[in-house]
Amino acid sequence: MGELIEYGKKALEYGNYADFKQTMDTVVEEVEEGFVKIGYLLKVARDTAVLQESGYATVNEFAEKEYGLDKSAVSRFIAINDRFAEGGYAPRLQEQYRGMGRAKLSIMLMLPEWINEEISPDYSKSDIQAIRAEVAEEEKTTDLEILMEEREDIYDRLENDLQRVLWKLGQDIPELYCKLWKEYMRADNVEQLAKEVMEIMAPAGEGMHSARISGIGRLMLSLKGADRDLVLINVRSGEKQRYGWDDMEAAFDLLMGSDSAEESWETVYGAEMPGVAPVQPESRKTSRVSPAVMEENNPAAGQN
C-alpha cells in the first residue's frame, strides 16, 4: 500500500497536461530515434578505432557478444541509418521519416526512393507491406516483356496516364466506378468533387491506388488531400506526374455519362457489367492501399 502511495506522490509531479505531454513526447521520440542511433553507433564502431581496446575484432563480434545482435540485425540497423538518417550518417532520422519506427523502415528499405517519398508515418506496417508486394510483383516482369505486351486500343485514344489509370480502375473495380459516377453527377464544382473523391478513394485522408497498364506496367495514384495535387508514380521507372483535380474532372467527363452508373460503365467498357458486390460495413481499420487487380482475377477484363 505504501508503494502505491509513493507512486501517487510521483504522479503529482506532472502539475498539468502540458508538462505531462511534453515528457511523453520526449520519451516517445527517444524510443523512435533509438534504432537509428544504434545504426549510427555501429557504423562508428565499424569505421573508427573505437573497438581497438575492446578485444573485439569486428563490429559484428562486438554486437553479438555484448548485445545479442546477430550479423543480419547489425546489417539492418546500419542500412536504416544509411538510407534514412540525416546525411546518411547521423544519430537522427531525416525529418520526413520521423515517427515511422523500425518495423516500417525495415520494409521501406526494399522500396525505391520515389515511392518512399509518398509514404507518411500514418501508413501502417500492413499498408507498406501491400505497397512492397505491388513493387515486387512488377519486378517479376522484364522490360522486354513489357514491350511485347498487347496494349488496349483505348489507351492510345486517352490523353494522359491519369485518364488511363482511372479507366483501368473503373474496369477492374466496377463498384468503385459506380461510387465515383454518383459523386461526379452530384458535384456542382471541382472542389466538391475533390472532397467526395477523397472520401471514396482515400477515406483515411491519404492513400494509393495501383493499376497495371499493359505496355506500361504498374502506375500508383497517390492521393493526399482535396487541396493537394494528385501524384501518379510509374513503379518501373520512378517517373512522377502531377495532376490537378481539374484533370480528374476532365477524365470523368470522358469516362462517365448516361442516366445510370451501370449504363455508363457498359458504354465505356463495351461489356455487360459484372455483378457488383453489396456495400460492406466499413472495417474499423481502413487500408490506405488498393492493389492492382490482376487480369486472371478480373471478370471484366477482356470482354470488350
Task: Describe the residue ranges of each PLM region.
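Accessory, typically intrinsically disordered or conformationally flexible segments
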Residues: 1-33, 37, 57-75, 86-89, ...
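Solvent-exposed, amphipathic alpha-helical segments
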Residues: 23, 41-45, 107-114
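Short, amphipathic alpha-helical "recognition" segments used to contact nucleic acids or chromatin
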Residues: 36-56
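Short Lys/Arg-enriched helix C-cap and helix-to-coil transition segments
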Residues: 55-57, 85-104
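Long, intrinsically disordered, low-complexity Ser/Thr/Pro-rich regulatory/activation regions
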Residues: 100-120
